[in-house]
């Protein structure tokens, strides 16, 4: 099993301190895995590692490159893509999440009991339906006395408008909203105005259109059903990698996007009868991140909101 690093994202395409691209893909049933660079017309071979992971380190991948992951010759978007500029069926685009220039170094998250929350849908909150449109209306929210906004899910879904609960790329920020850098810019602007940011995330199911995860591995299980389709595989065979995938996702929002709290959708549908429920493990991992990498911004970053009373003791951090 690949090690979970709370200080950086491992899955997908990321960059080392030396600027080299590090690629990591979980595809336990594949015989060959490559990266196809669309614009450069280059194919890079990944090496088969333990537990179904494939990887390579290369200087040939740079930010802005569009690419596909090739599984036994079939081209697919990266399951850990952070940007899908052409939507769910198009190529993934390489983004260096660490390149954004943050100005919120003095931000300290406010206590949860002081949150005055405005829940908003990015696509309908402003005339442009974008993160930039939210920034333009921040003075209005400040005037209302809002201290936190809760953004409905932004994981890439099919089309330009959706409630957000049909996302199929959990790491990718919706292209029609502006993509990942625009979300970083929004959070930075919110903190400058004294507003905390809560992000709604969905870990119990994926949407019906554009879902490539089953082609990579057993991300789903037939042990359980949800009202929205197959349940995610948190406790069946090969579930360690699936648990890792969603754990990396939660940590990414806190670390790379400076999100202050996560609202987990329908936690009752996260079916897990492991000795340690995934939600409890999430609590421990976020606490570890909070203790090891705390900054002025992070002193209260380990607070998470949940949808049910049952889940609150597992996800609330004090």
Q: PLM features: what roles do these ranges have?
A:
Residues 1-22, 41-119, 124-129, 140:
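The feature marks proteins involved in alpha-glucan
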Residues 25, 69, 120, 141, ...:
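Conserved, mostly hydrophobic/aromatic
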